[in-house]
Each structure stands twice: as C-alpha cells, then as structure tokens.
Amino acid sequence: MKKGVMRPGHVQLRVLNLEAALTHYRDLLGLIEMDRDEQGRVYLKAWSEVDKFSVVLREADQPGMDFMGFKVTDDACLTRLAGELLEFGCQVEEIPAGELKDCGRRVRFLAPSGHFFELYAEKEYTGKWGIEEVNPEAWPRDLKGMRAVRFDHCLMYGDELQATYELFTEVLGFYLAEQVIEDNGTRISQFLSLSTKAHDVAFIQHAEKGKFHHVSFFLETWEDVLRAADLISMTDTSIDIGPTRHGLTHGKTIYFFDPSGNRNEVFCGGDYNYPDHKPVTWTADQLGKAIFYHDRILNERFMTVLT
C-alpha cells in the first residue's frame, strides 16, 4: 500500500438481461442483493465483504465491464492521486458522491490499456453479511449457490502493457507479482498486487484496447470449487474450463459464463507475496502450462472469447 490504494472495491458489469443476470450472480454465485438505484442498477456483495457492495449490474446492449474501482485510505489520498494521474497523462473525470448509491466521490481514469478504473475513499460500511461483529459465527447459514466469499480480481486484455505497468506501479503503488515474457524480453502478461495476494488486477497483451476477460470470486476450499462445478452442471450454465489448476498463481479454479457472456471465475488457494519477494516469471513457450497446469495445452476459447 505504498501510495494509499488499499484493495479492489467494486466492478460494474454490463448485462443483456438484468433479471437473468441477477439469478446468476445472486442464486448461483451466491452474492447478496443489497440495493437498486433509479438507473435500474443492482448492487451486490459477497458475504465476507464489509462495504455495502462490490458488484454492480447494469443492463445494456453489449456485455462487458464499465469500470473497476479501488478503495483508497482517505479523501486526501484521493485528491493527491487525482493530481498524479493527470500528471501521468491519464484522462481523468470526477464522479460526484452518490452517483453510485452510498459511495463517495470517485476519480475515474482511462488506463493506457483502454480500460476505465476509478478510485474512491468512502462507501457505506455494512459489515459482513449475516454474522455479528461481536462473537461472530464462522459463516452465515443461509447462503446460496457457490457461497462466494469475496470479489477478488479482474483480468483485462489490451495493448500498451508497459505504459499500463508504469501507471499502476509508479502512480498507484501496485507491484509486479508474476509475469509472462517472450524470448526478446517483452512482457505479454502482468499480474499486479497491492497486498500479499497473488494479484488484484492482471493484464494480457492484446491488439484491441479495453477488452474484459473475467471477474473472479474467492472460495475457501478445493471442495468448494468442485461443488461450484456441480452447480454449473445442475443449472446448465455455460462452462469454459475446469476444474483445474493454474501454473500462474497456482490457484485452483473453474471458469464459466454469465447469461450475457461475461466470463466468471471462482477459485481457491494461490500464491502469496511479501515485499522481499521477486516477481515469478514464466516464459512464453510454457504458456500452456502457465495457464492450465494439468493439461498444458492452450484453450482457444479461453484465450479469445472476450467482452
């Protein structure tokens, strides 16, 4: 947390049919519906999250991600980072408090990769859902579906990875946890973190700007991932790959699609990092094993289906 950016806070997704998407994210993934607003957006959270929402669904003509938000320490930090983003050369816009329900003012910026991100300092604190703050039980007993624990990260496809790396490391205080490099030393994927997590956001080199690969949610155990696979089959949900293990981050994972075609991941495990750790490097000739550790073969759909 070198620059005051603490953690991923929310993601706003575009969906083609709001009620179908809500059934998916609420009843299958197990997120909790927290609110709706006058624009028709739906606000959800995972049970262990302390702020009011982490996922916002907006009905639109095309699927994809509108923006991903990160929480900063306080309003002074937000003001300082807005200035540094401008100095870096980013397109910056201030979104007033309340535009997202019960969220403070936000500073939105366009990364060189073509994705919109935003920073905010304040959001209504609702505490963990379904358990008390004093003498809490282990977990709520009436969770649905996969019982997602938290919104964990997003993976983006876009160009200008080096400039995006410089923005996230120099201005926002992320560090490089893991990477894939070509023979000539060019980095073609970068996994960036703010904490001891394997990553909080990741970028893959792609010819088009602003493409969205997946939104990821954390589960506690491998048995939970297998149970998620059962639920995917029970509900005839479109599956992408898994259950399997990544070489990158070593997370145990399964990927599937929401009704609009946005890719979701649920996973458990994964690597950890401390400040004295060096980045983990994979070479491009081992990309199959890096992505799918067991099969060691690239899956064309996984690599090319984007929103």
UniProtKB/Swiss-Prot annotation:
The terms under GO molecular function for this entry are: catechol 2,3-dioxygenase activity; ferrous iron binding
UniProt domain VOC: residue ranges: 7-122, 150-269
Identify the stretch annotated as signal peptide in this record: none
> Biological process GO terms, please?
toluene catabolic process
Q: What is its EC number?
A: 1.13.11.2
Annotated binding of Fe cation, by residue: H153, H214, E265
Reaction equation(s) it catalyzes: catechol + O2 = (2Z,4E)-2-hydroxy-6-oxohexa-2,4-dienoate + H(+)
Going by the record, the broad EC class of this enzyme is oxidoreductase
What are the annotated disulfide bridges?
A: none
Which Pfam families does the record cross-reference, listed alphabetically?
A: Diox-like_N, Glyoxalase
The record's section on InterPro entries has: Catechol_2-3_dOase, Glyas_Bleomycin-R_OHBP_Dase, Glyas_Fos-R_dOase_dom, VOC, Xdiol_ring_cleave_dOase_1/2, XylE-like_N
Pathway, per record: Xenobiotic degradation; toluene degradation
The protein's UniProt keywords, in alphabetical order, are:
Aromatic hydrocarbons catabolism, Dioxygenase, Iron, Metal-binding, Oxidoreductase, Plasmid, Repeat
Required cofactor names: Fe(2+)
Subunit structure of this chain's protein: Homotetramer.
* NCBIfam families attached to this UniProt entry: catechol_2_3
Q: Which family does it belong to?
A: Belongs to the extradiol ring-cleavage dioxygenase family.
The protein, known as: Metapyrocatechase
